[in-house]
Amino acid sequence: MSITWENKKTDSLVRAVLALKNPGEAKKFLRDLLTVSEIDEFGSRWQAAKMLNQNISYTTIRGKTGLSPRTIARISKWLKKGKGGYRLVINRLNKHHHSSSSKKGLA
């Protein structure tokens, strides 16, 4: 039997995440929802995705995150051929960072 993650429960979770207004709210929500270990694991996976996007080697990523080569390979696969979520957020954050940096120079 195949498990599907797209259902009413996860739709509700996605709406809850979208309701968060700032990093402080997100931290509170994540801490109530997940264990410290789970949050740390997700943080490591996110760091790996960003490093893979910068073409940083698996060895370096493993050293900085502690993730296994298998997990890094999965993240790489999802970054390249997944639903596009990693790429969407990386690009959006990079665009936001660049626009914020250029605005600082105008002040």
Label each PLM-derived region with a short phrase.
Residues 25-45:
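Short, Lys/Arg-enriched anionic-surface-contact patches
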Residues 89-107:
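Intrinsically disordered, low-complexity basic tails/linkers immediately adjacent to helix-turn-helix/homeobox/MYB/SANT
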Residues 1-20:
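General nucleic-acid-binding
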Residues 42-56:
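Short, amphipathic alpha-helical "recognition" segments used to contact nucleic acids or chromatin
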Residues 76-79:
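DNA major-groove recognition helix of helix-turn-helix
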Residues 60-65, 72:
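Short alpha-helical "recognition helix" segments of helix-turn-helix
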Residues 20-24, 36, 55:
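Residues at alpha-helix boundaries and the short loops/turns that link adjacent helices
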